[in-house]
């Protein structure tokens, strides 16, 4: 953590989204509203799935964990970002930065793997409907969830351990609104070659394995659906996948742009906008995407409201 006369900084200074004083309060209000909506919708969906027996199915177990991941994702990033709009000196402690980085990497991989597992669940439900209850049992679902959390944890541990070995002698100003790897590597006075290689290898491994699983699942889903004769059957099959495909496109599209694009296209300012999208905006959109046209979720919400009204 230290080399020669270099001492590890006790704090980092975050540059934030903008240094324009006139934009600080408007941006604070906008992102406070987004964060509030994110928490209310994701925690609301978690609670709804927990209390409604009709939603105790594999698809909603995974959706519940996706909502938890999104709520945690937003909470790791947004509160500190909101604070930077109100503080003249936008600081984060060294330990706070490391913890934020660890949590961010953990949740990014968790979401990626969850989207892959959800695609596999849809594949089994549509392509093997008779075997679905025996294949996707609750025990299997929770083993998959625990497995992907474990993989994400180990991956985050590797990257965070590498970050702890870096020295920051020349600067402690992070050109970002949170502690991400690219701006931290940029100000490191140590060689970051190994760190960058690990980010690329593990990032590619998890992203591509998730994307390949999703693509293969949907190839089989499409081949099965086109053989369904009734229009209602086709519509029902596709409608269960539309929300998931939207979530996959938003998340993986942004992550691929962020971490797997050519070096010549790299720009920290561009990264800020892309990071803002998948750390703040997507966690707000996901519960809306999954519940907006979902009849089962709407029916469950009506049942819960009706029960509470009847009790009172």
UniProtKB/Swiss-Prot annotation:
Cytoplasmic side: 50-57, 121-139, 227-239, 293-312
SS bonds (residue pairs): 97-179
Residues glycosylated per entry: 5
Protein's UniProt keywords contain Disulfide bond: yes
One MF annotation (Gene Ontology) recorded for this entry: odorant binding
Membrane topology reported for the UniProt record: Multi-pass membrane protein
Cellular compartments annotated: Cell membrane
PROSITE patterns on file: G_PROTEIN_RECEP_F1_1, G_PROTEIN_RECEP_F1_2
Main location: membrane
Sequence intervals crossing the membrane: 27-49, 58-79, 101-120, 140-164, 206-226, 240-260, 272-292
Entry GO CC: plasma membrane
Entries under Pfam families matching the protein: 7tm_4
Keyword check for Cell membrane: yes
Extracellular side: 1-26, 80-100, 165-205, 261-271
Keywords in alphabetical order: Cell membrane, Disulfide bond, G-protein coupled receptor, Glycoprotein, Membrane, Olfaction, Receptor, Sensory transduction, Transducer, Transmembrane, Transmembrane helix
Function according to Swiss-Prot or TrEMBL: Odorant receptor.
Membership in a protein family: Belongs to the G-protein coupled receptor 1 family.
Name assigned to this protein: Olfactory receptor-like protein COR4
Gene name of this polypeptide: COR4
């Amino acid at each position: 953590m230290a080399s020669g006369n270099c001492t590890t900084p006790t704090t980092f200074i975050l540059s934030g989204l903008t240094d324009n004083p006139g934009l600080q309060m408007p941006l604070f209000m906008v992102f406070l509203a987004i964060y509030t909506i994110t928490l209310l919708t994701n925690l609301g969906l978690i609670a709804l799935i927990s209390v409604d027996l009709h939603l105790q199915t594999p698809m909603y177990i995974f959706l519940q964990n996706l909502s938890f991941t999104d709520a945690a994702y937003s909470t790791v990033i947004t509160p500190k970002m909101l604070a930077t709009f109100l503080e003249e000196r936008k600081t984060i402690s060294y330990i706070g930065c490391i913890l934020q980085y660890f949590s961010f990497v953990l949740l990014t991989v968790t979401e990626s793997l969850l989207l892959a597992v959800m695609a596999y669940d849809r594949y089994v439900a549509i392509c093997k409907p008779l075997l679905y209850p025996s294949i996707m049992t609750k025990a299997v679902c929770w083993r998959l969830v625990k497995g992907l959390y474990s993989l994400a944890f180990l991956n985050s541990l590797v990257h965070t351990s590498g970050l702890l070995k870096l020295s920051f002698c020349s600067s402690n100003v992070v050109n970002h609104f949170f502690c991400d790897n690219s701006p931290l590597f940029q100000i490191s006075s140590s060689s970051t070659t190994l760190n960058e290689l690990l980010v690329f290898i593990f990032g590619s491994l998890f992203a591509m394995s998730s994307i390949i699983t999703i693509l293969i699942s949907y190839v089989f889903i499409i081949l099965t659906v086109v053989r369904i004769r009734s229009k209602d059957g086709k519509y029902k099959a596709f409608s269960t996948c539309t929300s998931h495909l939207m979530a996959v496109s938003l998340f993986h599209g942004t992550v691929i742009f962020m971490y797997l694009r050519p070096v010549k296209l790299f720009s920290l300012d561009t990264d800020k906008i892309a990071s803002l999208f998948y750390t703040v905006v997507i966690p707000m959109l996901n519960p809306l995407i999954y519940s907006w046209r979902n009849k089962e979720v709407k029916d469950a919400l009506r049942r819960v409201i009706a029960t509470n009204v009847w009790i009172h």
